Amino acid sequence: MLLTIDVRNTSIELGLFAGSGTHARLERHWRIHTNPLLTADELAMQLRGLIGGPLEQVIGVAALSTVPPVLRELRTMLARYWSHVPHVVVEPGVRTGIPLLVDNPKEIGADRIVNALAAHQRFGGPAIVVDFGTATTVDLVSAKGEFLGGVIAPGVAISGEALIEKAGLRRVELARPRSVVGKNTVEAIQSGAVFGFAGLVDGLIDRIRDEFDAFAGDDVTVVATGISAPLIVPESETIDQHEPHLTLTGLLRVYERNQQRRRT
């Protein structure tokens, strides 16, 4: 099986894939809290506990991290505990197969690149990829599979934290309120989070369609992923598909591309 590791600021998503290519399937997956102080040894222990059984079942590892301290420990862990299997960490210089048509390709986060690859292989192009993570990103993928750039906005959770810290409002459960107009503070905050971010994304996608002719037609797929996607997607008028494990699938594809390159 292939182990995939997606480290973000808020959480770490892990998945085990069986098979390859079009026959690959996600057998098991987990999400754990991100600790920026996590050491390589601690991360290895967590993985062993989650995977269970013989570690020999893992024949390869593909990973990314948008958290620099964890990225360093991730590299150390792979070298220390998984050196016997092929592994790929998505960072500048790693072959992804996605041309980055932007001013500075090194600025583009590995998560955005991997999502673009997965979306293009799954749905073709053109596509718009929305990731509801710590940040909310809206990225464009051309019909040729090129990354054309995108939009970065605050994430749902981080916006809520800002309200708590700066406005003195209390922490509330993120859930769909009864109405867009809240009758109390809790529902008002929930409305801003759920309907506000649905409107944000819908507005951005409408503007993208207006500005770029290649994204104005019915052949464009708008796909969403990310930890807050289940909350926002049902309220969106523009999102076509929800792929909860898009990033893990993208890591699988990057791994396969790099393995093919080693064999040629």
UniProtKB/Swiss-Prot annotation:
It holds the Pfam family Pan_kinase. GO terms for cellular component: cytoplasm. This is Type III pantothenate kinase. Its cofactor is NH4(+); K(+). It comes from Nocardia farcinica (strain IFM 10152). It is an enzyme of class 2 (transferase). It catalyses: (R)-pantothenate + ATP = (R)-4'-phosphopantothenate + ADP + H(+). K(+) binds at residue 131. It comes from the Bacteria. The active site is at residue 111. Belongs to the type III pantothenate kinase family. InterPro entries: ATPase_NBD (IPR043129), Type_III_PanK (IPR004619). SUPFAM superfamilies: Actin-like ATPase domain (SSF53067). Pathway: Cofactor biosynthesis; coenzyme A biosynthesis; CoA from (R)-pantothenate: step 1/5.
